[in-house]
Regions:
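Conserved short alpha-helical segments that host acidic/polar catalytic motifs at enzyme active sites
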Residues: 2-421
């Protein structure tokens, strides 16, 4: 493990290994309130559901290092308002923005460079920094390999100085700032720096622990004030990859089980689309390029494009149809004319990202689960009388009395199940 990076470079230089060929077979799912109410139950269901799909991930020989697991939740304002006060600032009622960031644990100069970069770019974009918070963790639950590669896990708390911004405008400014930070970090060669999430709406907790240990490692998740309207969870199984903290999912917009067989073509086509990208919504389109970072896995690349579509104004259901379309034909006798015209338009806009896939995704207005056009990855769901949707790779991930179940089933090829949160 100590020589991991050195040996990995030897393999890459010899063209024996490439990150671009990485694929996963995982467990994925969504818990959501069908009436759009934040609750502790959604968070606890999400944690329990993640624990239930532990068998969809691999375990290292040390018995504690996993391939990666994580959960994506809304930002609980009461919880983080207290953390802001600890920094010596008063929360003035403005939107609380939170960045979940991995830093190189044993390189203090790189840590300082990364923090300076984050603060500098956010300040340039008219954000004010409340401060940094070291996320409380329990490394005792980690295996030896996970602990050796464990990053310094921190959160940056901040706000925008213009309170008149709409939620979407604020998210766009945060997104553009994050992209600038990422580009500068690559330029400055800051290794071990990774932004899990940077948002005014949600936060992602993930890592190389066992799924059952997520709340034991991230102590924040045990706080009763941690409430949410949705929980997207993911258990990674690396079929031909080396696990790492940054490759654990969920990513910023979605969690993905499957593989994109058209990945190389999709990546090349995105480079073409970048030449035509233009929008008055962003300060400078060059800040957003490249949309797909070099060396990204297929899941990470899909997430990058999905996120860009969301942040540009496309809803999560529409973004799914653009990237992972239904199987359809102009000769269909059952498909309505309106649907044919929609699919024809989307087909002319974006090439399909094809391959076996089940996803759980959110744009902070919609929370969805969906299947690929052939239905090659399972996605099952249960809707309970207490207005909770439980969807994922397995049925029975959360214990619900049969008498409390309104409906249950599975998604067919190309189908989407969504909740407007």
């Amino acid at each position: 493990m100590k020589n991991y990076k050195k040996n990995l470079k030897i393999l890459e230089d010899g063209h024996v290994y490439s990150k671009e060929m990485e694929h996963d077979a995982c467990g994925v799912g969504l818990i959501a309130s069908t009436e759009g109410k934040k609750s502790r139950k959604v968070v606890e269901y999400g944690i329990n559901a993640l624990k239930a799909v532990w068998h969809r991930g691999a375990v290292d020989a040390d018995g504690k290092t996993g391939d990666g697991a994580g959960i994506h939740l809304e930002i609980p304002s009461d919880f983080f308002a207290e953390k802001i006060e600890i920094t010596g600032h008063d929360h003035d009622g403005s939107e609380i923005c939170v960045g979940m960031i991995f830093l190189p644990r044993n390189n203090y100069q790189a840590q300082e460079n990364a923090r300076t970069l984050v603060e500098s770019e956010l300040t340039k974009s008219n954000f004010s920094i409340y401060g940094w918070r070291q996320v409380p963790v329990n490394p005792k639950v980690l295996g030896e390999k996970a602990n050796l590669t464990r990053p310094e896990i921190t959160q940056v708390l901040f706000k925008h100085n213009n309170k008149d911004l709409t939620e979407k405008e604020l998210e766009r400014k945060i997104y553009e700032s994050r992209r600038k930070i990422e580009k500068e970090a690559i330029k400055d060669a800051i290794e071990g720096f990774y932004i899990c999430s940077l948002s005014s709406k949600s936060v992602i907790y993930k890592g190389m622990f066992l799924a059952e240990s997520i709340a034991d490692f991230y102590l924040d998740l045990k706080d009763e004030r941690f409430i949410s309207r949705f929980a997207i969870f993911h258990q990674r199984f690396s079929t031909n990859t080396a696990p790492s903290w940054d490759l654990a999912q969920p990513f910023r917009a979605l969690a993905h089980n499957g593989e994109i067989n058209t990945f190389k073509g999709n990546t090349n086509w995105m480079k073409v689309h970048e030449q035509e990208m233009n929008s008055p919504l962003f300060d400078n389109m060059e800040n957003l390029k490249p949309v797909i970072q070099p060396g990204s896995s297929d899941s990470a690349a899909l997430d990058s494009v999905f996120e860009l579509l969301n942040i540009s104004g496309q809803s999560a259901p529409l973004a799914k149809l653009m990237l992972i379309p239904d199987a359809w034909s102009k000769k269909s006798q059952t498909l309505s004319k309106d649907h044919q015209q929609l699919f024809n338009f989307l087909n002319s806009t974006m090439e399909p990202w094809d391959g076996p896939a089940a996803i759980a995704a959110t744009d902070n207005e919609w929370a969805i689960v969906a299947a690929d056009r052939n239905g090659l990855r399972p996605m099952r769901y249960t809707i309970s009388k207490d207005k909770i949707l439980c969807a994922g790779s397995e049925t029975g991930m959360v214990e619900i009395d049969e008498k409390q179940i309104l409906k249950k089933g599975r998604l067919g090829p190309g189908e989407i199940l969504g909740v407007r949160i």
